[in-house]
């Protein structure tokens, strides 16, 4: 900020004046010198006061306005500084430093095109001025960043817009427009604390800034604080009734809130079909609201689970965690659906994710239960082998054994190929194992609880299914198969 860092020490040439005018000029010059001393000590507030006194004594002196502009720039008061710089060049059109300060203020405020005109005028006055040459390049760079950002915003490439605005703000630190665009893109990227910080800084300087109010509301809206968001949108519209973005966001926020609440009410009343429809309608309102939509997907997944549409419920919960991979409730809901559909590996994976995030006793127990079911699912399913459910009675288990044992007995398949005989022998043995376990209350209890039966002293490796078969059908000679043509058998009981 070379133009701001130096104060002018030479007064502009004036025509001969009256004695009292000469006295005023001497007094003004004294004030200016005092201002310069404070400026050199970086006491810019005092420097400002003395330059103001100098201006009051000699309001037609361009350099005094130039000096006060430099001081205001150091204080970050660029809009006031611009007024002084413009006044300095109105008083002296050939005042190069005045043009540089005018351009620097324009650039700091984000008016790059106006800055270019000021720097061009400075170069016309002094074509070798290195500062004017560099600042002219800087102003053109800002215009280019602004142009790229506008295109990328339309493409929804928000990261690139943030990059361009960061570069532009290096030259235009007081430009609210650039800061607001950056904040809006940060919000679209889910970087809400950063976006809120930028918007809040602007609101501290200008509480009526509609764009900053809109961005604050947008952050709250995307964080699912919809009621608070609406308040900011309404305030932004009060400041700028034609603020299109705030109007759309306010409308979407109100619609989302209403649909979600109606869906929740229908769910609580047990009207799952209506709840499903309302959550679906809510999901169509604003695809950019990631957090709210994640909750809506999870809610709809819960509805689908109530309707026993478990695959649809799993899909909804998957969509929820895609939008918000920290959403514990969605992982829990999906894990339960996986359990209900006997997809135990997937359930274990979800419960592990939950437990790693929140190590509670409840989550630990859910994980252990899923791991147990997974272990059980990898053993032989004796209920499936016999074709009975887990609540089958003793008589039902016996009837099932009788049917399956006769179906797979090796003698029945003595005329089949070696491959078929081998498969039927295997099935016959499995049927015997299943009956041995499920017909014994203690063994059945251990099996149902997921205990390893071999570890409990029941070694099925030496098991002979024929012993069970003979005992069940009355011992040796009590039962025989007799072939009567292809595929027909007669059963003889003793």
UniProtKB/Swiss-Prot annotation:
The keyword Cell wall biogenesis/degradation does not apply. The modification N-acetylalanine is found at residue 2. It comes from the Eukaryota. TPR repeats lie at residues 28-61, 62-95, 96-129, 142-175, 177-209, 210-243, 256-289, 294-327, 328-361. It holds the Pfam family DnaJ. Acts as a co-chaperone regulating the molecular chaperones HSP70 and HSP90 in folding of steroid receptors, such as the glucocorticoid receptor and the progesterone receptor. Proposed to act as a recycling chaperone by facilitating the return of chaperone substrates to early stages of chaperoning if further folding is required. In vitro, induces ATP-independent dissociation of HSP90 but not of HSP70 from the chaperone-substrate complexes. Recruits NR1I3 to the cytoplasm. This is DnaJ homolog subfamily C member 7. The gene is DNAJC7.
């Amino acid at each position: 900020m070379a133009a701001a860092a130096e104060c002018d020490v030479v007064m502009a040439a004036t025509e001969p004046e009256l004695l009292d005018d000469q006295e005023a000029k001497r007094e003004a010059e004294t004030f200016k010198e005092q201002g310069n001393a404070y400026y050199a000590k970086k006491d810019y507030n005092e420097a400002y006061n003395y330059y103001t006194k100098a201006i009051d004594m000699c309001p037609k002196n361009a350099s005094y306005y130039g000096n006060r502009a430099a001081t205001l720039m150091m204080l970050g008061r660029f809009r006031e500084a611009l007024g002084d710089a413009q006044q300095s060049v109105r008083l002296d059109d050939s005042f190069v430093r005045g043009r540089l300060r005018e351009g620097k203020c324009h650039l700091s405020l984000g008016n790059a095109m106006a800055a270019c005109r000021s720097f061009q005028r400075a170069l016309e006055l002094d074509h070798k001025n290195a500062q004017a040459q560099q600042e002219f390049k800087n102003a053109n760079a800002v215009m280019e960043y602004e142009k790229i950002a506008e295109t990328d915003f339309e493409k929804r490439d928000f990261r690139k817009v943030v990059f361009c605005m960061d570069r532009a703000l290096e030259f235009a630190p007081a430009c609210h427009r650039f800061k607001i665009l950056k904040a809006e893109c940060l919000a679209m990227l889910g970087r809400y604390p950063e976006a809120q910080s930028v918007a809040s800084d602007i609101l501290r300087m200008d509480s009526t800034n509609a764009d900053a109010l809109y961005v604050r509301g947008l952050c709250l809206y995307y964080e699912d604080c919809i009621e608070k968001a609406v308040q900011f949108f309404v305030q932004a519209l009060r400041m700028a009734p034609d603020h299109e973005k705030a109007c759309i966001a306010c409308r979407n926020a109100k619609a989302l809130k209403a649909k979600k609440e109606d869906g929740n009410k229908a769910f609580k009343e047990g009207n799952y079909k209506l709840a499903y429809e309302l959550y679906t309608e809510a999901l169509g309102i604003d695809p950019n609201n990631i957090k709210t939509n994640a909750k809506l997907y999870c809610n709809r997944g819960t509805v689908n689970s109530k309707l026993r549409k478990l695959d649809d419920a799993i899909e909804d919960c998957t969509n929820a965690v895609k939008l918000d991979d920290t959403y514990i409730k969605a992982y829990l809901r999906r894990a339960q659906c996986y359990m209900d559909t006997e997809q135990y590996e997937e359930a274990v994976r979800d419960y592990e994710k939950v437990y790693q995030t929140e190590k509670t006793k409840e989550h630990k127990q859910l994980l252990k239960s899923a791991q147990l079911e997974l272990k059980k699912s990898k053993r032989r399913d004796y209920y499936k082998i016999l074709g009975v459910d887990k609540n089958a009675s003793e008589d039902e288990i016996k009837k099932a054994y009788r049917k399956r044992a006769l179906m797979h007995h090796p003698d029945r398949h003595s005329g089949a190929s070696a491959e078929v005989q081998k498969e039927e022998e295997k099935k016959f043995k499995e049927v015997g194992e299943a009956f041995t376990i499920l017909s014994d209350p203690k063994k059945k209890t251990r099996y149902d609880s997921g205990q390893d039966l071999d570890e409990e002293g029941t070694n099925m490796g030496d098991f002979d299914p024929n012993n069970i078969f003979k005992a069940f059908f009355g011992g040796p000679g009590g039962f025989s198969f007799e072939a009567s043509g292809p595929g027909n058998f007669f059963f003889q009981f003793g």
